[in-house]
Structure formats: C-alpha cells, structure tokens
C-alpha cells in the first residue's frame, strides 16, 4: 500500500486542453484550476517579463501570437520533416525550426532573448501546471502520476511523453491509452449493471488526435480487442477549415489579404473556435470582429450546413478507423453493445449522426463527460497502481494492446513481423534468425513499426549491431531475437547468438529524436530555473499590489469626510503628497524588484500610520484603529486594472 502522502494523480495531457483528476473519498475528483475551470488550455506563453501557462497564456494569445506556444502534442516524438509537421507549421504563428537529429524546436523570444524549446519541454510546462493545480487542491506535494496518450501514438511519441513527465519532475507510473482510460470511466459509471460481457466501442475525437478502440468489458476486466486512429485529426482541423473560409471571404469582400497578419489570424481563429462550438447547438451563428485588419471590421455569418459541408471529408474520414477496429476484432457492428463518445469534438451533431447511421440508428452513449472521462480513467489507474482505491477499483484489470505491428528487416528489405498489431501488452515474442552470407561476422538488427510489407514504407524505430559471430556458412548461426513490450507500450529488443553467447540489446527510444539522460537532466534544471523565475514574478506582482492597495486605501480613508475632519490640514497634505509620490513612482517603476516595493510600502506606512493612529486616538470611530488588513480589503477605486482581451 502506498502511504497517504504518495497520492498519485491522473493527467490527460491534451493537444488543446489538459485535465487532472485524483481518487479521494472513494471517487474521482476532477480538479478545477485557479480560474475555476476543470480543463486547462495546453498553452505556454513567453513575454518580456514572464512565462504564462494555461488560461493566462491563452487569454493573451492575440496580443502575443509569435511567442504563445500550443499544439506541442502535434510535434512530440515526430521529426521536422514529417509531412504533418510541415503542414502544421503553415498554420502556427510561432516559429518551428529543425534541431539536432531533425528534432523540431520551437523558437520564442523570452525576456528579450531568443530561446529554443523542444516539444517535450513545452509539454512538461503544461504538466507542471497540472501538477500545481492538483497540489493546490490537495494541499501537499505530488510526485506520482499516470499520463495518457492517444492509443495510436507510436513508440517515439510515447517515449517523448514519458520524457516530458521526467522534465516536469513527475514520476510517471504508467503511460495509458486515452480510449482505455475513458473506458474505465464508462465501466465505473455502468458498474451496477451486471450484464455479462459487453463489447464497447470508444470513439475519442479531441482537439488534435483521434482514436477508436474496441473493448470487451466483463466483471471489471477491460480487454482492448483492437485500436485504430489518426494522431493528426481533431477539432483544430475543423477550425483551420473555418479560418481558411473566412480569410477567403475577407479577401473577396475587402480585396485585402490577412494571411500575413498574425494577430488578425489569431483573433479570427478564436472567433472560429467559438463559432464551431455554437454551431453544435444552433443552426447559424455570426462572427463579428472589430478592426480585424487595417481598421476594417469583419462581420460574417456561417450556417451549420456550410460548416458541415466544408469538413465533410474529415468527418467521413472519422468513420474509417471504426470499420478497421471492427474488422481487426472480427466483430460485426450489430454485436457492439455501446458506442461511447469521448473528446470535445464528438459534440458536433454531424459526427454523431454519421456514427449513429453507421451503427444502424443505435443510440450513442453520452452518459460520461467527454472532456473529463480520460483524466477520470487515468486517476482510477493511478489509484490502482498506488494501492489507494477501494475494492470498487482495486479489482479492475486493464489489458491494452500494441497499436502497430512491430518487426525487423530481413534480406531484401522485407518486414518480418514479430508482434502483430493489437497484441495484448505487456508481451514478449522470440524468433530465431540466421546469417545471409557465409562467414558473416555480424548482423544489423533494424527494428520497424507499421503495417506495410516493405520496411521502407514503415517507421524505423532504431538499429543495433550484433558483432562477434564466429565464421560459419550462411544459415548456420542461431540468432535469437526477442521483442519485449512493457506496460507503457515501450519496446525493448535484444539479440543473442546462441552458439557464441554474444548478446546485445536496445531499448527502442528512437535514438535520433530521443532526448539523452544528460539532456533530460539539463531540461529538469532549466524547468526549475523557469519555475523560480515565475515565483519571482508572482512575488513582484504581489508586492506591487500590496503597495498599490495600501496607497489607494489611504487615499480613500482621508477622503472619508467623517475621518478627514479629525486630521489637521498639514497632516492631510503630508499624506496626500506621500500617496501621490508613491503612485507616480509605481507608474514609472512597474518592473522594480520585490524589495523596492517593500521598501516603498514601509516608507509610506512610516508617514501614514502615525498620523492615522493619532487621528483614531483623538476620539476615533467606534471600530478602533483599522489594521493594514482593513485598508487592503476595500479594493480601492484604483487598484490593479484588468483589461479585456479579444
């Protein structure tokens, strides 16, 4: 059993939004962030003075599009040359360049310096935010977490997500697949209804990724039969279509192109995202953006039918993986008991209709919250792994599968599969190979994942060499190759020459794109440094606010007629002068250090407090002397101002 202080959390690290849950009081609590939202934008922004994560980052994106990073999940574990990365770069306002080993690196300006971050580092910042949200709620530090990934994530994407966890200072107990996590939420929701074995299809369409998994659930055993999907299809692709549509409309109406105006595009994208959501519940909506480009106001309407038409190819594409999982699981669609919707994009009526038509009019299951189901399942798995949960969850068993076939290259560039796709993990497969030529001193083991017959069409995961094979005719040496997948879906491969006893192995961690231990350690240190800087900024803001509050509250106090009568003219002028000087100083020194603000506060208190206490002693108001607390609580006419961001 884990000790009480070792509470583990479940994090749904999403493309556009993330969510965190924890098992407590015999159920899962989905934890709201400091803004009261139960999901947090997966956004990180860098400014001249600070780093922002979550809602704060997304709220200022229109003012700072080049330095606000999102969609790190669409980059993680991919190469810069990947066609999907190249097409995404066209839509992103931030700059992505090719780093060492073709790793995509995100370039931003932070504190007036150019900085490069890997997708793992950006994701780790979002994970730190989710960790802090949980810590604020639980009132203690959190070390352990279960983090989810799309079921269709390949080996390098899983490994990179695990690295992001390490950089954030979390101990990632397990990486689990999002649809499987959602199935746990569904299974617990339906726990009372004991109806033997059920075939359940999880349809998970989020902001940037799409998964379909088919499971059988029986008495707390969740067995994934097949999984399919697209790690590059989601709500953002529907937003992109809307943005392109309105850019063309603006060009047509006003003969001007906004494609080069990053701020205008961002404001348009925000409006498109809002319009898309509105169209899930109404048949038509309008987009109104003041002064979008060169002072021109933009006003347009969009109907649900038009939105559906411009995305119909993508919507139809969502049905292909559904057919694929049924085929792989050798099931007819009539034997699916429940179709469960997960992910915000499943709220789109057309997608629901296509899915319902596919299943011959079957009612879809909407009983679980599509935004929170994945974090819910991850929190349950975290409780199981730390021995936290009650009997209700401790007897759950998850049997997941490898999403892609794994094998190695044999003579002639042929893909020889050792572990076929949809094999239950963890698993281990061994096969004996031999040499291709006489007296061959070594063999090159090249490990691939994918479904094609030729290795050149599949994804190379890694290579290693087995040397020191004694001279022998071709086909004589016995080389035993072992593929071993752990519970996170990460692969270890070893090869051994049985006769000579030579052995070599590799953990497939995509040598080219993978971060080394040293790099991860350096990133951990960087993360701590950034966190310390964030703390410093927070302290500065607090110190500045205390000073401002005190000054404005003092001003209000001496404006109160009842109290002002008790002050001599000289004292009143003395306080007014001190307050005016302080406010002027604040306006000219917004970026001053904490101790400067604190010094100014002491200085101002030194002038005001003696006068105020003298005033109260001279037969003051019945309440006695107000403390600093009373001053700072009244909010003041001035105080820190907030500004609406479009």
UniProtKB/Swiss-Prot annotation:
Signal peptide from the UniProt entry: none
Reported induction: By heat shock. Up-regulated by virus infection.
Record's subcellular location: Cytoplasm
Highest taxon of the lineage: Eukaryota
Database matches in CDD domains: ASKHA_NBD_HSP70_HSPA1
Region Disordered, annotated ranges: 626-646
Molecular function per GO: ATP binding; ATP-dependent protein folding chaperone
Membership in a protein family: Belongs to the heat shock protein 70 (TC 1.A.33) family. DnaK subfamily.
Protein task: In cooperation with other chaperones, Hsp70s are key components that facilitate folding of de novo synthesized proteins, assist translocation of precursor proteins into organelles, and are responsible for degradation of damaged protein under stress conditions.
Family matches, as NCBIfam families: PRK00290.1
Protein name in the entry: Heat shock 70 kDa protein 5
Species of origin: Arabidopsis thaliana (Mouse-ear cress)
Gene that encodes it: HSP70-5
């Amino acid at each position: 059993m884990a000790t009480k202080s070792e509470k583990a959390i479940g994090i749904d690290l999403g493309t556009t939004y993330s969510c965190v849950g924890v098992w407590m009081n015999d159920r899962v609590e989905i934890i709201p962030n400091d803004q009261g939202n139960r999901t947090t934008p997966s956004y990180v922004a860098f400014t001249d003075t600070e780093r922002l994560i979550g809602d704060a980052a997304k709220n200022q994106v229109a003012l700072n599009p080049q330095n606000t990073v999102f969609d790190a999940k669409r980059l993680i574990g991919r190469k810069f040359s990947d066609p999907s990365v190249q097409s995404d770069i066209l839509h992103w306002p931030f700059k992505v360049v090719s780093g060492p080993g073709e790793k995509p690196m995100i370039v931003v300006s932070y504190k007036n310096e150019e900085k490069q971050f890997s997708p793992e580092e950006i994701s780790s910042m979002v994970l730190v935010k989710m960790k802090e949200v949980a810590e604020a709620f639980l009132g203690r530090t959190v070390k352990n977490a279960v983090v989810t990934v799309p079921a269709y994530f390949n080996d390098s994407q899983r490994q990179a997500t695990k690295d992001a966890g390490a950089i954030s200072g979390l101990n990632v107990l397990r990486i689990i697949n999002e649809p499987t996590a959602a199935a746990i939420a569904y299974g617990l929701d339906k726990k009372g209804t004991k109806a033997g074995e059920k075939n359940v299809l999880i349809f998970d369409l989020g902001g940037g990724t799409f998964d379909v998994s088919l499971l059988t659930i029986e008495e707390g055993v969740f067995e994934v039969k097949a999984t399919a999907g697209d790690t590059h299809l989601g709500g953002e692709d529907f937003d992109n279509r809307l943005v392109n549509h309105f850019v063309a409309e603006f060009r047509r109406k006003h003969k001007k192109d906004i494609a080069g105006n990053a701020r205008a595009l961002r404001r348009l994208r925000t409006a498109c995202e809002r319009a898309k959501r509105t169209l899930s519940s109404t048949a038509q909506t309008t987009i109104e953006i003041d002064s979008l480009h060169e002072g021109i106001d933009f006003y347009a309407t969009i109907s649900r039918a038009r939105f559906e038409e411009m995305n119909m190819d993508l919507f139809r594409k969502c049905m292909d993986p559904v057919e694929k999982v049924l085929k792989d699981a050798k099931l007819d669609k009539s034997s699916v008991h429940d179709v469960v919707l997960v992910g915000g994009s499943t709220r789109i009526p057309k997608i629901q209709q296509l899915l319902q038509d596919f299943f011959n009019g079957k009612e879809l299951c909407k009983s679980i919250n599509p935004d929170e189901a994945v974090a819910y399942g991850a929190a349950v798995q975290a409780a199981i792994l730390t021995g936290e949960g009650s009997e209700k969850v401790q007897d759950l068993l998850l049997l997941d599968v490898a999403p892609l076939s794994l094998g190695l290259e044999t003579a002639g560039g042929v893909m020889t599969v050792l572990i076929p796709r949809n094999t239950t993990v963890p698993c281990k497969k061994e096969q004996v190979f031999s040499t291709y030529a006489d007296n061959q001193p070594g063999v090159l083991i090249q490990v691939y994942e994918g479904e094609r017959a030729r290795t050149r069409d599949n994804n190379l995961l890694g290579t290693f060499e087995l040397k020191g094979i004694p001279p022998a005719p071709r086909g004589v040496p016995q080389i035993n190759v072992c593929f071993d997948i752990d519970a996170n879906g990460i692969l270890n491969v070893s090869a051994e020459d049985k006769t000579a006893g030579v052995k070599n192995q590799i953990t497939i961690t995509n040598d080219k794109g993978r971060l080394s231990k040293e790099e991860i350690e350096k990133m951990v240190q960087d993360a701590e440094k950034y966190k310390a800087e964030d703390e410093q900024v927070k302290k500065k803001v607090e110190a500045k606010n205390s000073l401002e509050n005190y000054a404005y509250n003092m001003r209000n106090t001496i404006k109160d007629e009842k109290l002002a009568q008790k002050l001599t003219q000289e004292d009143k002028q003395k306080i007014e002068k001190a307050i005016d000087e302080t406010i002027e100083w604040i306006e000219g020194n917004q970026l001053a250090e904490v101790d400067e603000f604190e010094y100014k506060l002491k200085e101002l208190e030194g002038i005001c407090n003696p006068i105020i206490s003298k005033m109260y002693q001279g037969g003051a108001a019945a309440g006695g002397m107000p403390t600093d607390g009373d001053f700072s609580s009244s909010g003041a006419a001035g105080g820190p101002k907030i500004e609406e961001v479009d």
